Swiss-Prot record:
InterPro entries to which the protein is assigned, alphabetical: ATP-cone_dom, NrdR-like_N, RNR_NrdR-like
Boundaries of every ATP-cone domain copy: 49-139
Cofactor binding note of this UniProt entry: Binds 1 zinc ion.
PANTHER family the record matches: TRANSCRIPTIONAL REPRESSOR NRDR (PTHR30455:SF2)
Keyword terms: ATP-binding, DNA-binding, Metal-binding, Nucleotide-binding, Repressor, Transcription, Transcription regulation, Zinc, Zinc-finger
Pfam families, per the entry: ATP-cone, Zn_ribbon_NrdR
Organism, scientific name: Pseudomonas syringae pv. syringae (strain B728a)
Name of this chain's protein: Transcriptional repressor NrdR
Amino acid sequence: MHCPFCGANDTKVIDSRLVAEGEQVRRRRECLACGERFTTFETAELVLPRLIKQDGSRQPFDEEKLRAGMQRALEKRPVSVERLEAALVHIKHKLRATGEREVKSLVVGELVMTELQKLDEVAYIRFASVYRRFQDLNEFREEIDRLAREPGKE
């Protein structure tokens, strides 16, 4: 680490603490050349993978686009903003956990479907009807029947 006072490369860490609810590390450092002390903050750079669209094109992950799609499905449904945000955090966590630099957009779509199914089944059906391009009532009926057959449903 360069000393901001004299530019020397030799510094030592005298104290480290977690701050910002564990999201940052605060370090007190001392320059071994001039003796000045200074503070640094470290945060992890958590980059989400790029998306590979069905046509093969690539684009950066867009959290706002994801949020808008989920909000559209959840419109006029009894789901709090907090639960929606928690679902978004869970999706982003799963994407980061892949360790991949690029993922197919289908992976994101399936993660959204999983989270919406947990939040609200009506929102799930709304999203699925667009995402899976339902063509007629039978496709809706089949998906609703599949939901009803899942374990834990009455």
